Amino acid sequence: MRIQGISGSRGVAVGNVYKYIQEEIVIPDYEVTDDQVEAEIGKFASAMAATLKQLDTIRQKALVDMGADEAAIFEAHMQIAQDPSLSDGIKSLVENSKMNVVAATAQTIETFAAIFIGMDDPYMRERGADIKDIGDRLMRNMLGMNPRGLSHISGEVIIVAHDLAPSDTASLDKNVVKGIVTAAGGPTSHAAIMARKIGRAS
């Protein structure tokens, strides 16, 4: 089989295929009552604290493995996560529309990401994927799902996935992962940028 694509990071890689399928996030479909609003907001606060802690751990790993420029990606993610317009948008949907906090997060993230995805500049379009990465992490923490990641892989492999978030790429063991193939993303994605930094074909 011959598959044609766009190179995100130049090189040749040989290894076993590791198909990475992300666990789907199922958005709960229920409204909250007035007396449940405070608890929903509390879920958001707890998930945010966990998200920031995880992002800081990834930032530290990226700093050691790749350098300050790549670590700065996750510093930016932490800043985006703490943007008042993001948290205010989520809280407003919970308080005024009585949406559960996971559904409110999904809608707010989609709105924010769509702004970037609709831009003409390829680099800015890719930032929409970064926002979705932050939102996915928040929702996974709200739902008690294990953080996704690729740090557990063993053997020499080529990762095949629909897409890889920056946090996915930062968790890779460069001694194990020899190449990356994704259906989405491009040369300006943070995943491609980090693949180039660690010298892996993508």
Where are these regions (language model features)?
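Non-catalytic, soluble scaffold/interaction modules
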Residues: 1-202
